[in-house]
Structure formats: structure tokens, C-alpha cells
Amino acid sequence: MELAAWCRWGLLLALLPSGAAGTQVCTGTDMKLRLPASPETHLDMLRHLYQGCQVVQGNLELTYLPANASLSFLQDIQEVQGYVLIAHSQVRQIPLQRLRIVRGTQLFEDNYALAVLDNGDPLEGGIPAPGAAQGGLRELQLRSLTEILKGGVLIQRSPQLCHQDTILWKDVFHKNNQLALTLIDTNRFSACPPCSPACKDAHCWGASSGDCQSLTRTVCAGGCARCKGPQPTDCCHEQCAAGCTGPKHSDCLACLHFNHSGICELHCPALVTYNTDTFESMPNPEGRYTFGASCVTSCPYNYLSTDVGSCTLVCPLNNQEVTAEDGTQRCEKCSKPCARVCYGLGMEHLREVRAVTSANIQEFAGCKKIFGSLAFLPESFDGDPASNTAPLQPEQLRVFEALEEITGYLYISAWPDSLPNLSVFQNLRVIRGRVLHDGAYSLTLQGLGISWLGLRSLRELGSGLALIHRNARLCFVHTVPWDQLFRNPHQALLHSANRPEEECVGEGLACYPCAHGHCWGPGPTQCVNCSQFLRGQECVEECRVLQGLPREYVKDRYCLPCHSECQPQNGSVTCFGSEADQCVACAHYKDPPFCVARCPSGVKPDLSFMPIWKFADEEGTCQPCPINCTHSCADLDEKGCPAEQRASPVTSIIAAVVGILLAVVVGLVLGILIKRRRQKIRKYTMRRLLQETELVEPLTPSGAMPNQAQMRILKETELRKVKVLGSGAFGTVYKGIWIPDGENVKIPVAIKVLRENTSPKANKEILDEAYVMAGVGSPYVSRLLGICLTSTVQLVTQLMPYGCLLDHVREHRGRLGSQDLLNWCVQIAKGMSYLEDVRLVHRDLAARNVLVKSPNHVKITDFGLARLLDIDETEYHADGGKVPIKWMALESIPPRRFTHQSDVWSYGVTVWELMTFGAKPYDGIPAREIPDLLEKGERLPQPPICTIDVYMIMVKCWMIDSECRPRFRELVAEFSRMARDPQRFVVIQNEDLGPASPLDSTFYRSLLEDDDMGDLVDAEEYLVPQQGFFCPEPTPGAGGTAHRRHRSSSTRNGGGELTLGLEPSEEEPPKSPLAPSEGAGSDVFDGDLGMGAAKGLQSLPSQDPSPLQRYSEDPTVPLPPETDGKVAPLTCSPQPEYVNQPEVWPQPPLALEGPLPPSRPAGATLERPKTLSPKTLSPGKNGVVKDVFAFGSAVENPEYLAPRGRAAPQPHPPPAFSPAFDNLYYWDQDPSERGSPPSTFEGTPTAENPEYLGLDVPV
């Protein structure tokens, strides 16, 4: 039994082709169970189609075969793309022993890949007579069939068929065959012989030992789709189908997808490959086209090649057919809308139309090429009363006289009796046959009354057979060279029941003396090729070269006429071509080199306005006239030339005057040019002398706007330091008061003082910071108030009462709402957008460098690393220094390149800090590992309260390509949209049930502990008055009162209560609490009180408003009123006197216990309290979100260590609040160049973070 199995595999190996290159492909049919169009030629049709065929591109339909039919032409078929149908046949067996695979791309009755139906003698009563020989199919003999990819099996009403029920069809079906149905009828007239004992488990296709079924699926080891045996090493390659002889994809019996030169592949090699080195698409020399299940170097004839590498019969949308010079056809994409084409039957809007009728024949008027087919049925000329279609008239068929090509087939089974031929198609040259009638015929003529064909221009039948039968009066069928029309060996002419050739010759219906006796009908116009010469469409014995009119010349056996102006010659040629300059002699005149009917007289040649005058001499040659008149040429002489006219004296005078004027103008122009030349030489000499003596520098204007910001120089006596807020490597920050000389004003300020013995570089850096801060003018960027040039330089800035934003969100984690977070994001983005507009790169944006002026107003600060770009700069390259690694963009770490887009990266990290309530980015990861981590694609995780909308904005900010990051103006728009509907984008648990946003903080309460901090004037109120900013000046009497002023002050009484005094002056009415303020409150305390608190305010103490009358020049321009993402109020409130002036109603004083909860800001979207669920966030390595309360202050964090080469600072007891003025997020690995400040500072803790590296050390 094993020996027999190996013998079967040896037979299969012998049948395996060496590659797809020598595979013979043929077309299938599509007749299903219909009777053949010509039963007498049906077997011949099958023989022509399948003789030597190995792959059937279509269906293999074997129907209506007689019992004695010889079917040996089927024995080479190995693969069928569609289905196999064996029906109504009387043969005993069908030799398909080599058929391995049925792909089922088309299915019989939409379900079956193999159908065997009604193969037996039709017997009355279904019982054969005793001893009678019964015909019909006995055995399938599909011994090599081991794969059906799609479709089931239908075997019915074949009473002589045996062994169909012994086949293990499960082994034949592919594992992914969803239509694996088997409907098998086993009713037989007689018993069948059993399978051979050599067949394992009695699975066979016939009774002999060679008909045993080869199992290639059910016997396989686990995981094998197909195999050659039961061992795990017998598995076939995954691209194999029908079995294999080895494990490689070149050992397959058939390919599951595509056969590439004997190797099974999932895809054919692409025609174009991409070169990653040159970033170009290159032609692939190994590229192949897809043709069925094969990969071919070029598409077969009559198929169209596409740019995507496929062979198709119809071009895709927006493509057009193009025929190359070598005759190959391809689909080419239209550069503009494709030209209109004519569609035939079976295409587009005529897809369901059966025949050409009077209703659709006008679709083909003027068409030279029809994409589709043409069919003429009896209904075409009989009409259809049901659809009100009139009969087609013979004269209407003349629309096809211009037709030259049909891409489908031509089928004619009815034709008008008044037309003895098909001469309406006399210019038809090609029938391509891309679509065939019944899947077999490209030309079918049957049952017609014509006498000859008349297709005199037909030169090609691209595919399919020609069927001409049952035309009782048709002659000249055998005089056509059909073999010259066919393009592949499977094409042939099938003819029967036409008029006998002897009768045609007897009636004189013979060819004109044509070349080789080939013609389409009688007469000289029906020759396929002429034996002598061709004049137009007519064959002639000779051309009219020497006699006859019109005279002709010969070119490539064509008789072509001479020009009409050529003079006919006697006994010699008249011309050498068809043009007027190719005549031997002219019939009338010669205007060299052309023969003309008359000489040109006043004729204007092409593209000329000058007429030409010529006359004919004695020899008939045209000569130019002595006078060439251009206008007023009415007087002509006897030769037809213009007569000579005497010049008028007026003309001479005019010419002289014009000449003199022209000479004067030329002289003036020359004089001016000479003078200017001398001036230029003198100017050049003077400039050279000045440059040589270095008296004047050359001008190189940049076009940049001048920076008109003012630097305010303050005296040390005007400043009073109150307490230390923080200390850094280069100086200390104090809380202080600025008391301008000569004024009764106290302004709370922050004073940054350099340490003693600081390096010159440190002095330069703090002056650079002063230069940057003095030039900004935005409500969201901290401004410089002045500079004090003492022995240690001091910078004076606004005092932000709420400290830095990082400590603020950490301290009030449970009291912040979604609207607060999104409003801060909007304000920071607006500040950074302003810095981008003024070409300032911050380089150090982080939550620690954003100060809180009020709970609703934050400002960007710390410009120690900021750099102002010049007018022609787009980026800044740093040369060293401390940098915040975990906040920096990837291109800013090793290349030291900083742009506005690198600030966008830092902005994304800052937003992440806010959304995690102050968590540390990349917590627990050393700073040196950050670049590698970012290059590998790791980013900070999504904060728990963020929706995907907010997080995706962060992710866009962290794109490697800086050009892919959003601009700040885009970030302003995005977060402004989110701030209008905050709870949709930031989800904080129990936000609606929590307390309102806090007013003060630990840092703010520490500022109020000093008595000197009461009764202060905000710096912006002192410097920037804003009259008429909100509304026009009210007219006298409007509202019944004049303007009054008011401002806010805050103190603490002895009982620790916070008392707010808000008092109006007598000149100004109370203002609406809904009126927006650009500063959103005072610098000392926000005047935007809650309505509940506002109702309790009573009488307010008065204060001298004289400080508010001081005006100073300021280079900034107030921006339009903005609501930072909130909805602005629709009403227009009275205008405040100054920008950050709080607006309240006059109320009695109100004493509050503890911190005062504020109301929702003016114009807020939702009136609701805010809180955050106090749940503990889970830790992690990259960007771990820990409990922000576990962080403590920024200074006490034990993770931040002293850098190399510097002594660690002595620990200090943690203060009650986190000053965070000494930034601990930076590290300079080589601090020697920057000086060595003392390791400790009296009363102020300092720290440096080792996670942040210096730029002067390679990362």
C-alpha cells in the first residue's frame, strides 16, 4: 500500500511543470446548461479551445457530448480558474487525470465548483431494458484533484457513475472554503466495482489501483494545511495548494495564490520599489504582472497592463486605453478628465441591454471605437410593442460606417433582407474579443440572408472563435484568410450549413483578381490585398501616371493624385508628390517654388501685415513689382502692379521735423546719461574714500522694528526688603516694597539680588534677563518693573502673591476644577504665543516658572534661559549652561538647538504637570537616560483626569519632527474651545459636589503675615492706567452719577481673620461684578468676590487716590479683552480706571473666618463648585503620577542631589510653604566656569537636581 502511494506521488511529480513560463493558458466558456449555438461544431469548438491547454482562465464546461466523442484534448488540463461542469454527456469517462486544482473564482449556481449532472441515456420510466447497452458517465477519473479552493460539489442524475461516494471530499476542500457543500446522488442502475485494495480506507476515483485518492490534508500532522505524508516534516509550504513534494515553496503541486516562475508567492513582485537611500521610486527589474494566478513579465496579447501591475480586460476609473508603438496595450491615468468614450452592450449604462435597437442605436453615432459588444437579434428589427420600441430601419445602421474597433464581440443573428452584406461595417478593423459570446466566440453570424460579408477592412480577431453557420445564401466564407486574422493558436473558424462554394462559383460570385485570391466579396473593393495597385478602396491594374485624369504618382503600391495646378505631361510623369511644389510643370503660373492659379496681387501672407505685389512675366513666372504699395493702392498699371506716385512736399516737411525732434531727444538723453555717469563716479569715489578712512559704516538695514521698551533705573533707597523668599546659585529673591521717591505709594515687589563675588558671566546673564523682561508686554507674561545697579545687581519684578503654579496645584489638589486647569492652559498658551510673536524663545517653560497672580490669572516668568531671535534667525544654538532635560525637546538636548517649536514640547510637559496636580515628569528616571527613552518612542502617560482629546494635544506637542507640532496660536484655539465646556475634556470625580476654588494659599498667607504688606498699590495699577478701555466715556448725567474710583486692600486683624476693604470714592459709581478685567484682579488680592461675600460688604474706608493718578509711558499695547477660554459677558460695564482694578459693589466690610472662597469668575461657563477626588494615583517608572501631597515642597525633595564638583547644601528645616524660587530642576555638570557660590545661605535652603544636565557635557 505504501509503495502504491509513492508511485502516485511519483506520477504527480512527473506531471509538475518546471515553471509558469511555459504554461499554456486558454479561455473557458460560459454557456452553463444552454444548448450549443452549433451542435454540429460543438466538439470542434471544445477541441480548438482546450488542445494543449494547461490552465483554463474561466470555466471548463463539458456538455452535450456524444458517446463516441474523443476527448483526448482534455488530458493536459491541470488547473481551472472557475468551475468544472460535466452535464448531458453520453461519454463513459472524461480524461481529466491531470486536473489538480479548481479555484472556484466563478461558481455554478453560485455554490458549486464541481457539478456533474444528467450524464446518462434518457430512459422511459428510469429503468434500462435488459441487455441494452447504456451510455453515460461511468467514472470521474479525477485522480490528481486534491484541492477545491472555493465552492462545493454537486453530483446528481448520473445513474452510471461510480465511486463518487467513496471520495473523502473533506480532504479535497481547502480549510478556508466556506461553501464546502456536497450534494451527491448515489442512485445507480447497477452495482459498482469496489475500490482497489491498494486504496487506503477505500477512497478512490475508479476501480484501478491508479485511481486511489491522494490524501493531502486529513492525514497531515497538526498545523499543516497540506502535506505529502503524516510526519511533521512532510508539511507543505503555506503557499502550496493541492499538495507538494517537499517543504519549500518551489515544491508545490499548485500555488495557493500566485505562481512566480515555478515558485509560489503571496504576491507577485511589484513593478516599482522604493529606495530608502535615495528616497526614490525605482523600476524593479524583477517586477511581474498579475495574470490570473500567475506572475508574468508582460501581459498576454489583448490584455491591458496597469500601473499597479495587473493584466485586465477593462481599464479602471479615470484611466484610458493607450496603444504603445510596439503594439502593447496598457491603461494610462488621465492627466485631465478622460475623454468621452462610446460604450457597447454589457458596459456601463448598457450593461443589461441585450441587443441594438432603435432606442439605443444613436448611442453609437460617430463612434470609432466601442468599448463593449454589439448584438443584433430578431427583436432589433421586429420592434417591441411592450416597450414601445420601433423596428430598426436599414438606413439607421449607417451610424456604424465610422466604426473601426470593437473591444467585445460582434453577434448577428438577424439582418434586414434589403442589405445583401455587412458593408455598414466596411471600416471595422479590429474585433478584440476581450468579452466573448458564450465565453467562446468573438464573431458570430448565423441565420442571415446576406450574400457576402463585406468586412473589407477587418484585419484582426484578437481572441475567441469565429462561428459562421446556417446562412443559406452566404458565399465568400472560404476566400477570407482567417488564419491571418487570428492572434493565438486556440482560435479557428467554425462554419456549417452555408451556401456551397460550387454554387457560388457557378453563379459567377468569385473574387476580383486580388492577391492570393482573398476577398470579402465580389468586385475590386472587396479584396483583402490587391495584386497590383490600390486607389482609395479599389484595386486597379495600373495607376494614371502617364495617361488619364487626374494624373497620379505611385507610393508604396498606392495610386495618389497630383496637385490640381500641375500640368499633365505626355509620355512622362506629371508630379513627384501631392503638393504644389512637386509638379514637373505648372498649369498656370509659378510662384517659385509653388504652382499657383494667379500671381499674388496685394495678398498678405500669413503672420504679416505687409501685402505682396507680383506680376507674371513672359514665361509665366511671378516677379515682384518695382513698387510695393502698402496702402491706398487703387491705381494699378497694365501689369497689375501699383502705379508710381509722386511724394507730396508735406510729407518731406513732416519727415524733416520728425528727424530734427528725434535728434534733439537723442542728444538730451545722452547728456542726462553722461551727467548721471559722472555723478555715480563721484559718489563711488567719495564712498571709497570714506570707507578707507573708516569715517562712515556701510548701511545694512535689517527691516526689524525698533525695540522702544524703557528700562526703569531704581535707587536702592526706594527699595525695602521685607523677607527672603528663596535663594539660588547666583542670587537671592526677596519680598520687598518699592516706594517711589516723592510719592506716597507702596508697591509690593519681588527683588532678585545677585550674590557677592559673582562671575562676570553671571552679571551678563542677569542683565540679559532684564533686557528680555523689559521688552515684554502681555497680561500673561511677567514684566520687569526696574533694575537697581548697586554693587550686586538687583532686578525688581511684580510680586505674585500666590507663588508658583506648581506649588499652587499641589497644595490645592482637592479644590481645583476642570475649568481652572483648562483656563491656566489657555493663559500659558497665550503668553507663549505672544513670546513667539515677538521672536522670543523661552527655553525654560515649566509649571515652576509660571506664577499665580490670582486663582484665575497666571503669568510666565523666569527668563534666565530665554533668547531673543534676530530678524533673520529662526533658531538659537546654545553653547552651554544648565538646562531642564525632562522638559526639553529631543532636538534641544544634543544639538542644543532651540526654537519656538521646542517651547511647544515644554508646554506639553507643563500641561501634563497641571493635569497630574504637580507630578514629576519621568519620575525615577535619570536625566541621562531621557534622550534614549524619547528616541525609542516613550512619552509621558495619559493623566487619569484627561480625556483622549487633551492627551492627544500633549502627544502632538511631543512629536519628534518639530514641524509636526502645533503652533501656539493653534494651542490657544484648542484649549479655548475646551475651556468653554471643561467637564467634557477634563473629568474630575465628584467635581460638582466639592468646594469652590481656593482664594489663598500657604504662600499667600505667608505674604500677609507681615504688617508692612497691607495697604499696598498693585504695580500694574500704578504703571498702566486704562481709561476708556472697556466702554466709551459715559455722558454726563448717564446713570445719575459721575465716575468714582475704588481699589482693594487686604489685612488680617488680630484674630487671624482676613478682612477685605473695598471702598468706592465719591466720584465713581459701583461697577458690575461681571465686568471683565485684563488682570483678573489686584496683585495683592483678587477682587473678583463671590456674590455671597459681596452682599456682606458694608462701608469701606477711604484712601487717597492720588497714586492712581500717576501715568507712565509703557511700550506695550493692551490686548483686547479676553476671557481666557470663558464666555465673555454680553453687557458693557462701566470702565475701570486701571487694568487690574478689581470691580465690586460697595458693601459693608465683611470678616471671614479662614480662607475666603471665591465666586465663579465672570463669564464662567458653568456655575458649580470644583474639587478633585482625593484618590491616590498609581506609581510607575516613566512619568509616574504619585500622590502629589507626597512631593512636599520643591526644595525638600530628597531625590534632587548636588551636582558633581559641588558640595551638597546643608539641610534646612522645611518652611511652612514651598518658596521654589531657587530652581532645582537644572544641573550643570561643569560649574567651575560659573563661579562657586557659598554652599549654604543663611535662612534659605537651596538645592540642585542631578536629573538635569548641562549643555556643555555631551548627553
Swiss-Prot record:
Record topological domains on the Cytoplasmic side: 675-1259
Record's keyword terms, sorted: Activator, ATP-binding, Cell membrane, Cell projection, Cytoplasm, Disulfide bond, Endosome, Glycoprotein, Kinase, Membrane, Nucleotide-binding, Nucleus, Phosphoprotein, Receptor, Signal, Transcription, Transcription regulation, Transferase, Transmembrane, Transmembrane helix, Tyrosine-protein kinase
The protein's Enzyme Commission number: 2.7.10.1
Region (Interaction with PIK3C2B) residue spans: 1199-1201
Subcellular location: Cell membrane; Cell projection, Ruffle membrane; Early endosome; Cytoplasm, Perinuclear region
Modified residues (Phosphoserine): 1077, 1082, 1106
All residue ranges annotated as the Protein kinase domain in the record: 719-986
Biased segments, Polar residues type: 1237-1247
Region spans: Required for interaction with KPNB1 and EEA1: 675-688
Positions bound to ATP: 725-733, 752
SMART domains for the chain: FU, TyrKc
Disulfide bonds: 26-53, 162-192, 195-204, 199-212, 220-227, 224-235, 236-244, 240-252, 255-264, 268-295, 299-311, 315-331, 334-338, 342-367, 475-504, 511-519, 514-527, 530-539, 543-559, 562-575, 566-583, 586-595, 599-622, 625-633, 629-641
Signal peptide as annotated in the record: 1-22
Membrane topology: Single-pass type I membrane protein
A biological-process GO annotation: positive regulation of epithelial cell proliferation
Active site annotation, chain numbering: 844 (proton acceptor)
Residues that bear Phosphotyrosine: 876, 1111, 1138, 1200, 1252
Positions in the Extracellular compartment: 23-653
PANTHER family reported for this sequence: RECEPTOR TYROSINE-PROTEIN KINASE ERBB-2 (PTHR24416:SF137), TYROSINE-PROTEIN KINASE RECEPTOR (PTHR24416)
Subunit structure comment from the entry: Homodimer. Heterodimer with EGFR, ERBB3 and ERBB4. Part of a complex with EGFR and either PIK3C2A or PIK3C2B. May interact with PIK3C2B when phosphorylated on Tyr-1200. Interacts with PRKCABP and PLXNB1. Interacts (when phosphorylated on Tyr-1252) with MEMO1. Interacts with MUC1. Interacts (when phosphorylated on Tyr-1138) with GRB7 (via SH2 domain). Interacts (when phosphorylated on Tyr-1252) with ERBIN. Interacts with SRC, KPNB1, PTK6, RANBP2, EEA1, CRM1, CLTC, RPA194, MYOC and ACTB.
Name of protein: Receptor tyrosine-protein kinase erbB-2
Originating organism: Canis lupus familiaris (Dog)
The organism's taxonomic lineage, starting at the top: Eukaryota, Metazoa, Chordata, Craniata, Vertebrata
Gene name of the record: ERBB2
